Amino acid sequence: MEKISRKKGSSYHRRHHVALVFQNYNLIDYLTPLENVRLVNKNADRKILSELGLDEKQINRNVLQLSGGQQQRVAIARALVSEAPIILADEPTGNLDEETAKDIIAILKRMSLDRQKCVIVVTHSKEVAQASDVVLELKKQQLKEKKK
């Protein structure tokens, strides 16, 4: 992986290397899921949203009419269609019920492998951590690899 510049003024460069998935989704509330995804990649099609479990009706409605799990799927779709090789997901299942959370993690893992993206997840959930390939634990300002 190429080095990402830390120089002042290089935020454009960093934005194209890291896609973010927030706990609170950060969707544009007056747009549809497809329009939200196309903000990141104007060539994105409905297929990505279908692969993430949204049906045609959900894809065409306002994002505020979707459940939390459906909105999180839209946020993940935005990250997946970006050109960024790294996805940083901050508590991507924090607002979701256990079943939806499991679905989201499985989808994120499968689709990131399909699209060759590195996913870094920040979480307090043991279940989410257990689904990861590598777990790093931050404790008392020390970062250590945790054995699974």
Model regions and ranges:
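Conserved ABC ATPase signature
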Residues: N62-L66, Q70-Q72
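Helix N-cap at the start of a conserved alpha-helix in ABC-type nucleotide-binding domains
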Residues: E98-T100
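Hydrophobic anchor residue at the start of the ABC signature
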Residues: I76
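Catalytic Walker B motif of ABC-type/P-loop ATPase nucleotide-binding domains
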Residues: I87-D90
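ABC ATPase NBD coupling module
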Residues: M1-A19
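Conserved ABC nucleotide-binding domain
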Residues: R6, I48-L64
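Conserved catalytic motifs of ABC-family nucleotide-binding domains
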Residues: E83
